[in-house]
């Protein structure tokens, strides 16, 4: 015959079971259960399995150490990349300033060359004029 279930529970049934369960949990002080959950299984039955767990835990610890080192390296790499980006921006700014200054200097030198050529042409014209005047005066006399 199937078990009979109550369709409706009254408050005494619910609170009574909650109180008794709470009392059992608080009053029963089982160190074995706490040891099991805090330290893991022990004894001859769990020996090889416990060794496997320790081995796996050691591997997990090694992986954690490697990942922490990798994260540290990534952070350092990011810092170096930031420094490199700052240096490249500075270099780009310096290159732009150099380009502008070189264009300005090229113009100055071009004008200076033009001035020197103009002065030389003027001196040559004056010398030629003086020579012509001397020759003309020599033939007039």
Curated annotation (Swiss-Prot):
It is found in: Golgi apparatus, trans-Golgi network membrane. It comes from the Eukaryota. Keywords: Coiled coil, Golgi apparatus, Membrane, Phosphoprotein, Transmembrane, Transmembrane helix. Residues 52-112 form the v-SNARE coiled-coil homology domain. Residues 1-51 are annotated as: Disordered. One of its GO terms (biological process) is cellular response to type II interferon. GO terms for cellular component: cell surface; clathrin-coated endocytic vesicle membrane; endosome; glutamatergic synapse; Golgi apparatus; Golgi membrane; lysosome; phagocytic vesicle. It holds the Pfam family Synaptobrevin. It is a single-pass type IV membrane protein. Signal peptide: none annotated. The chain crosses the membrane at residues 116-136. The modification Phosphoserine is found at residues 17, 30. Residues 1-115 are cytoplasmic. Identified in a complex containing STX6, STX12, VAMP4 and VTI1A. Interacts with BAIAP3; this interaction is increased in the presence of calcium. PANTHER family: VESICLE-ASSOCIATED MEMBRANE PROTEIN 4. Belongs to the synaptobrevin family. Involved in the pathway that functions to remove an inhibitor (probably synaptotagmin-4) of calcium-triggered exocytosis during the maturation of secretory granules. May be a marker for this sorting pathway that is critical for remodeling the secretory response of granule. This is Vesicle-associated membrane protein 4. The gene is VAMP4.
